[in-house]
């Protein structure tokens, strides 16, 4: 089986409609200024599609992790329920206005925005305040999520999801609204994310190398287990590499190690061997006695790490080996940095991998996918993000997809081959979302699984 194809925004009629778009504007903000607008820019094609065709946009997003108030809480006299200054989307509205070259209306309370929505005309854009100012958005109780979803759904006619970064969340705005409206469409960013991951997981150009880093083996167990049946090479870096190396009997000094995962590391290495997957681990290291950024850290001559030292990046010999394996592959998927790239003296390994992928993509047609989160940040910092085939906007979502899990925010969207509900067809009525589509009832859509081919 493969990823179930979903209807995209191109399948929806948006002219004259108020289109609810769940975007991912969870961007870094410092002193009221956005420091990286990548996620805002990534949503522009979907927004511009609606505006060009004469629809209006009602945008929903979260930012940060505010505590969240209850819908039943008394409304403050001079504020809104759940408001936190550090998590307001007002700076996003200002930046989006600059990018679109037009005014973006801002509703200061996402659940008290009916008057704003009612005034919208074709070509208008409205951004709702942070949906997570309300605890019901991500409540564990379905009835609470549904109550919030009904309020939001009443603002519009058509639902589009372009928030891959939160597709692994079962929330009022990701799964609740399409259930209320009876249909949901993938925006261009969501569609792009799904298509790239589907290709690399189900039918990639080969050889395929997975580059996996980060701090803990325990964080990547399911990813490694799922990917071993799909890849040709496995490159391991970051602190998780030292658990594998201790499991092989090497000295790791005072480097980070999950002692309770040594047997698991041995098991994964054995499974890789059984499946003819070549595993590459560091053969030298950049070390220090303390976790600090010094200009002249110790570089080991071989795989062994001296007593009293911790490894904080891969060494030059390892970099060359990793560059060579990337150069001979046709596809790469990268999740997790090779070292503490935030400190310049430990960034060489991570940046070298990024450069090797970027060069391979631009010069040799390598399919290169960055799995979001810290890896996306590292690619941006290295200057190589623009050279990749795809930089995912979803850290947690991409990780769960690589682990072989289905994503609730994708599963709920209308299937490409969906038929009109029998009752609606018999009555000859319009589809629930008002778009003219053949919509799937909520009950049917909710049971569709987004499944990857078994390794």
Curated annotation (Swiss-Prot):
Belongs to the phosphoglycerate kinase family. ATP binds at residues 215, 220, 239, 311, 342, 374-375. Coiled coil: none annotated. Residues 417-455 are annotated as: Topogenic signal. This is Phosphoglycerate kinase, glycosomal. (2R)-3-phosphoglycerate binds at residues 23-26, 39, 61-62, 64-65, 132, 168-169, 216. ADP binds at residues 214-215, 220, 238, 311, 335, 341-342, 374-375. It is an enzyme of class 2 (transferase). Pathway: Carbohydrate degradation; glycolysis; pyruvate from D-glyceraldehyde 3-phosphate: step 2/5. Monomer.
């Amino acid at each position: 089986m493969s990823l179930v194809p979903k209807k995209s925004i191109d399948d929806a009629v948006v002219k004259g409609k108020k289109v609810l778009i769940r975007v991912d504007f969870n961007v870094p903000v410092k002193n009221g200024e956005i420091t990286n607008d990548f996620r805002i820019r990534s949503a522009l094609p979907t927004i511009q599609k609606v505006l060009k065709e004469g629809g209006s946009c009602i945008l929903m997003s979260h930012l940060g992790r505010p505590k969240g108030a209850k819908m039943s809480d008394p409304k403050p006299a001079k504020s809104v329920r759940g408001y936190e200054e550090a998590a307001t989307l007002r700076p996003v509205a200002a930046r989006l206005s600059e990018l679109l070259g037009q005014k973006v209306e801002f509703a200061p309370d996402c659940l008290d925005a009916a008057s704003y929505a009612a005034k919208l005309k074709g070509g208008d854009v409205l951004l709702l305040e942070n949906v997570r100012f309300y605890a019901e958005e991500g409540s564990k109780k379905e009835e609470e999520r549904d109550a919030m979803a009904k309020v939001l759904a009443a603002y519009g006619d058509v639902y589009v999801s372009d928030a891959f970064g939160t597709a692994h969340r079962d929330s009022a705005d990701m799964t609740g609204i399409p259930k209320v409206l009876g249909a949901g469409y993938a925006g261009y960013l969501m569609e792009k994310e799904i298509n790239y991951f589907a290709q690399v997981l189900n039918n990639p150009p080969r050889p395929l190398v997975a580059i996996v880093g980060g701090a803990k083996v325990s964080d990547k167990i399911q990813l490694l287990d799922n990917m071993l049946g799909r890849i040709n090479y496995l490159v391991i870096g970051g602190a998780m590499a030292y658990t594998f190396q201790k499991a092989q009997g090497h000295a790791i000094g005072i480097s980070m190690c999950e002692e309770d995962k040594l047997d698991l590391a041995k098991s994964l290495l054995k499974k890789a061997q059984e499946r003819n997957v070549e595993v590459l681990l560091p053969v030298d290291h950049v070390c220090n006695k303390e976790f600090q950024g010094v200009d002249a850290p110790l570089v080991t001559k071989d795989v062994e790490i001296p007593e009293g030292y911790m490894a904080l990046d891969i060494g030059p010999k390892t970099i060359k080996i990793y560059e060579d394996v990337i150069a001979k592959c046709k596809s790469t998927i990268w999740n997790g940095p090779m070292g503490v790239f935030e400190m310049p003296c430990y960034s060489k390994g991570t940046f070298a991998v990024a450069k090797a992928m970027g060069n391979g993509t631009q010069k040799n047609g390598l399919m290169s996918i960055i799995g979001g989160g810290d890896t996306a940040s590292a690619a941006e910092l290295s200057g190589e993000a623009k050279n990749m085939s795809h930089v995912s906007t979803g850290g947690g979502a991409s990780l769960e997809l690589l682990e072989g899990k289905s994503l609730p925010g994708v599963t709920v969207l209308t299937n490409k081959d969906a038929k009109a509900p029998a009752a609606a067809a018999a009555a000859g009525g319009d589809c629930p979302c008002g778009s003219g589509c053949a919509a799937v009832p909520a009950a049917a859509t909710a049971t569709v699984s987004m499944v990857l081919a078994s390794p």
